[in-house]
């Protein structure tokens, strides 16, 4: 029985991780989880999985859940805020921490978990995008496995099994192209949040859905792949694949290309990460290779999707520039979802911040958090958000 902690248990990845744990309850036990404001989901998790610990980031929700547990005589150790996140991430009994929490808030507890010797099933892109150098160094020092949960990185990870990283010629990170793959740039001027949230293939949370529509999500994945697989940016290419059946490919120096194909269900890469290094019987509908139809591939449009181009620039510059890229995008996406800016202004704001702030090297987590705070403050003050 493997003891699991999920950071961000009520979100899209967290919910699907719980589904895998439920289906394989003879192998996994939810010992601890974190959540923010989703009261009903939190209560369901507590009553269904009987975890020992729960960390809640929103004060009002924390008090409400605490009252419910006291009234109903439910035994659980409830914790609040960042201290709670760190506590559950470093529990002695926890063996694997699933970091599915969205945003920069996941960086510190993930690092703390690594320093406590916990293996990580990583679904929080921001952790590697902003702190990749610190995270991978800590993982090496503590002999910790970083197991990718993203479908693309999970696919790359599988394609690399039994092969040497030094033999990699090119990593192809596939992308569906999002809802606006066939749209012209001028057609994107008046895009609404509702339109941008309609992803053609994946069922995801709001933030990642908007990021997918701008292809900034793919840019974040490129930076993530750089750190996960220790590969230069010149060897990481984005390949638009509208059918979303090939989840990524690795080309080797001898010309061989290994690809991972599967149905579009996040529970598959989650299951692989939880069970690694073994495989278990499927928890998802298998891919019908006889009826999957034609598979097409095309180059991304870097002019229409400038966010992808900026991601490569930020990644190559290194230092705190990926943090500036990520933080500005987080705030801009939130502004767009609240109808405070237009769709194309998301990338404009990201570019503005990358040009405004000086790049610096990273010595510790504080450098990352300070850079993020400055970017957020600048945008909110300038755009009255």
UniProtKB/Swiss-Prot annotation:
Pathway given in the UniProt record: Isoprenoid biosynthesis; isopentenyl diphosphate biosynthesis via DXP pathway; isopentenyl diphosphate from 1-deoxy-D-xylulose 5-phosphate: step 1/6
Covalent S-S links between cysteines: none
Function noted in UniProt: Catalyzes the NADPH-dependent rearrangement and reduction of 1-deoxy-D-xylulose-5-phosphate (DXP) to 2-C-methyl-D-erythritol 4-phosphate (MEP).
Binding-site positions, Mn(2+): 150, 152, 221
EC primary class: oxidoreductase
Cofactor(s) the protein needs: Mg(2+); Mn(2+)
Annotated binding of NADPH, by residue: 10-13, 37, 124, 126, 205
Pfam families, sorted: DXP_redisom_C, DXP_reductoisom, DXPR_C
Statement: the UniProt record of this protein carries the keyword Coiled coil: no
Keyword terms, alphabetized: Isoprene biosynthesis, Manganese, Metal-binding, NADP, Oxidoreductase
GO MF annotation terms: 1-deoxy-D-xylulose-5-phosphate reductoisomerase activity; manganese ion binding; NADPH binding
Protein name: 1-deoxy-D-xylulose 5-phosphate reductoisomerase
Catalysed reactions, as listed in the record: 2-C-methyl-D-erythritol 4-phosphate + NADP(+) = 1-deoxy-D-xylulose 5-phosphate + NADPH + H(+)
Binding site for 1-deoxy-D-xylulose 5-phosphate: 125, 151-152, 176, 199, 212, 217-218, 221
Assigned EC number: 1.1.1.267
Domain of life: Bacteria
Family matches, as InterPro entries: DXP_reductoisomerase, DXP_reductoisomerase_C, DXP_reductoisomerase_N, DXPR_C, DXPR_C_sf, NAD(P)-bd_dom_sf
SUPFAM superfamilies: 1-deoxy-D-xylulose-5-phosphate reductoisomerase, C-terminal domain, Glyceraldehyde-3-phosphate dehydrogenase-like, C-terminal domain, NAD(P)-binding Rossmann-fold domains
Family as reported in the entry's similarity comment: Belongs to the DXR family.
Organism: Clostridium novyi (strain NT)
GO BP, sorted A to Z: isopentenyl diphosphate biosynthetic process, methylerythritol 4-phosphate pathway involved in terpenoid biosynthetic process
């Amino acid at each position: 029985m493997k003891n699991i902690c999920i950071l961000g248990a009520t979100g899209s990845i967290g919910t699907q991780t719980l589904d895998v744990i439920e289906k394989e309850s003879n192998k996994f036990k939810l010992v601890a989880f974190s959540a923010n404001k989703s009261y009903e989901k939190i209560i369901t998790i507590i009553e269904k999985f009987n975890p020992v610990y729960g960390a809640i980031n929103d004060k009002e929700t924390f008090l409400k859940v605490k009252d419910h547990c006291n009234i109903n005589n439910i035994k659980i150790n409830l914790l609040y805020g960042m201290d709670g996140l760190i506590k559950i991430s470093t529990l002695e009994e926890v063996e694997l921490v699933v970091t599915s929490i969205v945003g920069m808030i996941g960086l510190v507890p993930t690092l703390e978990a690594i320093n406590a010797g916990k293996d990580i099933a990583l679904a929080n892109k921001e952790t590697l995008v902003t702190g990749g150098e610190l995270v991978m160094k800590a993982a090496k020092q503590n002999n910790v496995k970083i197991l990718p949960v993203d479908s693309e990185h999970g696919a790359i990870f599988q394609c690399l099994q039994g092969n040497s990283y030094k033999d990699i010629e090119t990593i192809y990170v596939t992308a569906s192209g999002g809802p606006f793959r066939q749209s012209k740039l001028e057609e994107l001027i008046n895009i609404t949040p509702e339109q941008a949230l309609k992803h053609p293939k994946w069922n995801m949370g709001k933030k990642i859905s908007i990021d997918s529509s701008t292809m900034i999500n793919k840019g974040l994945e490129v930076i993530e792949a750089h750190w996960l697989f220790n590969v230069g940016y010149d060897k990481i290419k984005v390949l638009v694949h509208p059918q979303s059946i090939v989840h990524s490919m690795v080309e080797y120096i001898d010309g061989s290309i290994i690809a991972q194909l599967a149905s579009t269900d996040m529970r598959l890469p989650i299951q692989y990460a939880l069970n690694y290094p073994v495989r278990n019987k499927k928890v998802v509908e298998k891919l019908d290779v006889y009826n999957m139809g034609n598979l097409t591939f095309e180059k991304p449009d870097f002019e229409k999707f400038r966010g992808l181009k900026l991601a490569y620039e930020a990644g190559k510059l290194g230092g705190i520039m990926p943090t500036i890229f990520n933080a500005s995008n987080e705030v801009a996406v939130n502004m767009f979802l609240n109808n405070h800016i237009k769709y194309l202004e998301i990338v404009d704001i990201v570019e503005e911040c990358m040009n405004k702030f000086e790049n610096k090297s990273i010595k510790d987590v504080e450098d990352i958090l300070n850079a993020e705070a400055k970017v957020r403050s600048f945008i909110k003050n300038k755009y009255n958000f």
